[in-house]
Every structure is written in structure tokens, then in C-alpha cells.
């Protein structure tokens, strides 16, 4: 099964300042392991204006082929507007 989830990265010397990539990966892989595609970026400390970036087109593609987002990834994708157009098209 393919998942959309967060992969932690950033400085090893400062564990209190994590950053995350929003990635598409096989569900059996490690959290920070090899991934199929990077579709976004998330900074939980919101230190920059672009603290959340998502390639909406690619996210919609992966969702259309059956990728399952984790709860946190789903919340971030919703915040980025990935689900907005789909809801309007279906109505």
C-alpha cells in the first residue's frame, strides 16, 4: 500500500527544530527511509511565510491512484487546499 506521510529531516545537532517532507512512500518503509516522491514541505514552528508547501497537482494524482494519507498528512493536505476542488466538482 502506498502512503502519503511525513518524513523528518533537518539538523541532527538541534533535535528541537524538526522539519518534515511530505512524501509518497510504501507503507512498509521506515519513517525517514526511501520514498517514491516528495510532494511537499512542512515547518511546524512556522518560522517562515512558506511554512507549508504542497504540490497540489501531484498530491491529487497520488490520491486518485489510491495513496492513503496519514491523519497528520491529511490535515496538512486539507489546509493546502488539495481537497477543495474535488468537493466542488462532486457537488
Curated annotation (Swiss-Prot):
* GO function terms (MF aspect): rRNA binding; structural constituent of ribosome
The source's superkingdom equals Bacteria
Q: Which UniProt keywords apply?
A: Ribonucleoprotein, Ribosomal protein, RNA-binding, rRNA-binding
Gene3D superfamilies in UniProt: 3.30.1320.10
What InterPro entries does this protein's entry cite?
Ribosomal_bS16, Ribosomal_bS16_dom_sf
SUPFAM superfamilies named among the record's database cross-references? Ribosomal protein S16 (SSF54565)
State any GO BP term from the record. Answer: translation
Q: Which Pfam families match?
A: Ribosomal_S16
Q: Which GO terms describe its cellular component?
A: cytoplasm; small ribosomal subunit
Describe its function: Binds to the lower part of the body of the 30S subunit, where it stabilizes two of its domains.
The annotated subunit structure for this chain is: Part of the 30S ribosomal subunit.
The family note in this entry says: Belongs to the bacterial ribosomal protein bS16 family.
PANTHER family in the cross-refs: 30S RIBOSOMAL PROTEIN S16, SMALL RIBOSOMAL SUBUNIT PROTEIN BS16M
The name this protein goes by in its record: Small ribosomal subunit protein bS16
Recorded source organism is: Thermus thermophilus
Amino acid at each position: 500500500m502506498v502512503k502519503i506521510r511525513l518524513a523528518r529531516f533537518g539538523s541532527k545537532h538541534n533535535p528541537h527544530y524538526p522539519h518534515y517532507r511530505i512524501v509518497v512512500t510504501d507503507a512498509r518503509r521506515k519513517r525517514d527511509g526511501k520514498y517514491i516522491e516528495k510532494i511537499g514541505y512542512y515547518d511546524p514552528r512556522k518560522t517562515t511565510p512558506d511554512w507549508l508547501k504542497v504540490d497540489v497537482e501531484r498530491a491529487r494524482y497520488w490520491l486518485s491512484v489510491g495513496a492513503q494519507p496519514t491523519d497528520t498528512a491529511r490535515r496538512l493536505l486539507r489546509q493546502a487546499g488539495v481537497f477543495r476542488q474535488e468537493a466542488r466538482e462532486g457537488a
